Amino acid sequence: PEGREGSISTVPGSYGAWIQTPEDELEMARQLGAVAAEFARIEADFGRRLHLGLEPEPDCFLETTAQTLAFFQGSLEQGAVPEIRRILRCSQEQALFFLRRHVGVCFDTCHVALQYENPAEALQSYRNAGVLISKIQISAALRSPASKEGLEALSAFREPVYLHQVKGLGSDQRIHSWPDLPEALSEIPATAGIQELRIHFHVPLFVSPASPLTSTADTLDDSFWREVRNGACSHLEIETYTFDVLPKEVHPGDIIESIVSEYAWVLGKI
């Protein structure tokens, strides 16, 4: 609508293992530059601002806040700015302006929690670096101790529809990674020193899974909501999409009532 912005979330460049060379990074950046140029044309012609948000995700090219900031301050500018200049016939300064106005980050709180990052601090890092927060996706990951009881409880969440990357925090504070839940369940008993597991399985924000499982909804603390209220981003999206694959032990029941409950939870925080 007139007077509003449009945010579009997208993959963070690529699945991580597919990017092998600096040229691969520059090719992604050039493509993003072409998007920024097209969005600049749309805004000039129709007065409607659109922006694209790259969504860091476990095992993807961009996983962590630090990796994302490095890309935005390095390869993205190197590849995208010349492409914008070529398409729009504009100056270096104008091209950089269009890039920063139309390409940013989709901040998924489930994904941030999986990296054992503090959501409020991550938001502040992007804002301090001048990176646009295109959209905040409010979501929670599944959390479990790396105990026999925890692994048994997690077995109910094995399903073939979605990829459920797993991150484990070691006693040495090192983060261990598994590409999907079945691999994690088979390998963790042989991996010493894992204290906690976080699983890329979106669970409803208002639901507390049965012990010993919990969720990362508690990482969305007062400092995070203060950043939201202070204007970190105007687009918030509740992103629980797993109702069709949730085990019955944690499924909240009626879908419509569940969506209502999620809105009530978020609005209560705001």
Regions found by a protein language model. Name each.
Residues 223, 242-270:
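Aromatic-rich peripheral "rim/lid" segments of glycoside hydrolase catalytic domains that contact
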